Amino acid sequence: MKWATLFMVSCVLMFFVMNNINEVESIHVEQAGVCEFTGEFPGKCGNNGRKMCVEAMNKKNKGSPGENKKNLRCECFDNPVVILGRPKRICRCRNNC
């Protein structure tokens, strides 16, 4: 009987503790000042895909003035669709605007 009472009291206390805990809401902070560029280029990513994407994006946007190419961050994805036997890669790059 003593153990049953102790169990019931601990359950009630646990219930009160769990009710007093506030839910933590995840806050989505929008990344202000971040621009995203996507491009499709010939070839596969390989081991240095990020570097190849940065170079390809710099060549592609060579003529645009004021472009901050120093902070360019890229990801490389191999395109699963091969057209006419030529592999392609997709580069998604982000830059501070």
From Swiss-Prot:
GO terms for biological process: defense response to fungus; killing of cells of another organism; signal transduction. It comes from the Eukaryota. Disulfide bonds join C35-C97, C45-C76, C53-C91, C74-C93. Pfam families: SCRL. It is found in: Secreted. The keyword Repeat does not apply. One of its GO terms (cellular component) is extracellular region. Its main location: secreted. Residues 1-26 form the signal peptide. Keywords: Antimicrobial, Disulfide bond, Fungicide, Plant defense, Secreted, Signal. Transmembrane segments: none annotated. Belongs to the DEFL family. This is Putative defensin-like protein 227. It comes from Arabidopsis thaliana. The lineage of its organism: Eukaryota, Viridiplantae, Streptophyta, Embryophyta, Tracheophyta. The gene is SCRL28.
